[in-house]
Each structure stands twice: as C-alpha cells, then as structure tokens.
Amino acid sequence: MCPLRSLLLLSTLVLLHHLPHLSLGRSLPPTTAGPGRSCLNYSQNLLRAVSDTLQKARQTLEFYSCTSEEIDHEDITKDKTSTVEACLPLELATNESCLVSRETSLITHGSCLASGKTSFMTTLCLKSIYEDLKMYHMEFQAMNAKLLMDPKRQIFLDQNMLAAIAELMQALNFNSETVPQKPSLEEMDFYKTKVKLCILLHAFRIRAVTIDRMMSYLSSS
C-alpha cells in the first residue's frame, strides 16, 4: 500500500498543477529538522516574498485587473519543465506499483541535502525546480527593466523576491546556461507590462507553493 503521506503530496501537486486559480495562502505545518532543511527555509522565504510582492501589486495595480479571478492564467514553464511529474514521491514513481523503482544515488553539490547524496528521482525534481526558478528569475528581471523605463514610476519588482529566488537557486546549485533577457524596445506598452506582471506573479506564487511543499516533503523524508 502506498504511504498516505506520499499520496497526499501527489494529490496536492496535481491540484496545484490543474487548478491555478485556487487561493493557497495556508502553509504546511512546521516539520522537524532534516537533511533538506536548508532549502526548506529558502523555499519558505521565497513563498513569503512572492506573496508580499503579489499583495503589493494587487494594491498598486487595482485598476489593472490584477486579481486571480480577473487575469488570464499563464504558465511560462509549460512544455519546458515538468516539475509536478519530476517531483513525484519515489513510492509512486513506478507504473504498476508503489515500490521504489530507482535507488541510484547521485552526488549533488548544492546545500539542499546535507549529505550531498540523493536519489536519481530527487535529483530530477530539484533540477526541475531550479529550471523553473531560472525561467521566472530571467522573466522578472526583463520585466523590471521595462518598468524602470515607465515615466509614471508606478511599480517595480521587490528586490527581496528576486533575492529569494537567487538564494534558492544558489542552494540548489545546478550548472545551467543562462542567457540574460533584454527588454524589447519595439513594444513599450507599460499597461500590458503591468498586466503581464500580475499574470506572472499569480503563476509564480502557485509554483512557489508547489516548491515549498516539495521541500517540506524532502526535509521530512
């Protein structure tokens, strides 16, 4: 029989993946210290930062349709990463049973796992999370560069959120080529940029909840 905790995690990840419009403000109960506690702290910090940034954006951009019910939801990681699938608990990572199918250990260099040694499936999960963070970090940086050109100087991205993303990426420590995005000068429509900011913040908060729950699961495993 599959462990109940793994099934609960799976149902949560699937729900987050398919129902992005839900409000998920509640955090998980505190877990005991474990090998993944370092990244759990970073993920909790990230969730707080993106929640605060989203709240400020909704207040500042109240006339820009910035609520979850008003925006058109968009996932910039779609067809590029597969975090929900990659982060399935090992007990559920087989086709016909709940037995662990892969026990191969890999050496990782990040601080998310204190031992530096983790399973193949866990490494895939952390790698996918890293790629998610990298895509959002690049997108937010490019968007902030546009907002800095806005004569109204109405809103900018909270540097605490960008720093929280960077900290978790550094803790994961996967080497991946990064191509900085530059703001497009062809279409400098600041209204569209602010609407897009709302869309991205809502999507990223959902992803931050998913990441936080995965880190909680890993830290208590």
Swiss-Prot record:
Q: Where are the glycosylation sites?
A: 41, 95
- InterPro entries referenced in this protein's UniProt entry, alphabetically: 4_helix_cytokine-like_core, IL-12, IL-12_alpha
Cysteines joined through disulfide linkages: 39-112, 66-198, 87-125
Q: Where is the signal peptide?
A: 1-25
Which keywords appear in this protein's UniProt record, sorted alphabetically? Answer: Cytokine, Disulfide bond, Glycoprotein, Growth factor, Secreted, Signal
Give the molecular function GO annotations: cytokine activity; growth factor activity; interleukin-12 receptor binding
- Annotated GO CC locations: extracellular space
Subcellular compartments:
Secreted
Q: What is a biological process (GO) this protein takes part in? A: immune response
**Family from the record:** Belongs to the IL-6 superfamily.
Q: What does this protein do?
A: Heterodimerizes with IL12B to form the IL-12 cytokine or with EBI3/IL27B to form the IL-35 cytokine. IL-12 is primarily produced by professional antigen-presenting cells (APCs) such as B-cells and dendritic cells (DCs) as well as macrophages and granulocytes and regulates T-cell and natural killer-cell responses, induces the production of interferon-gamma (IFN-gamma), favors the differentiation of T-helper 1 (Th1) cells and is an important link between innate resistance and adaptive immunity.
Q: How does it assemble?
A: Heterodimer with IL12B; disulfide-linked. This heterodimer is known as interleukin IL-12. Heterodimer with EBI3/IL27B; not disulfide-linked. This heterodimer is known as interleukin IL-35. Interacts with NBR1; this interaction promotes IL-12 secretion.
Name this polypeptide is given: Interleukin-12 subunit alpha
**What is the species of this protein?**
Cervus elaphus
The coding gene here is IL12A
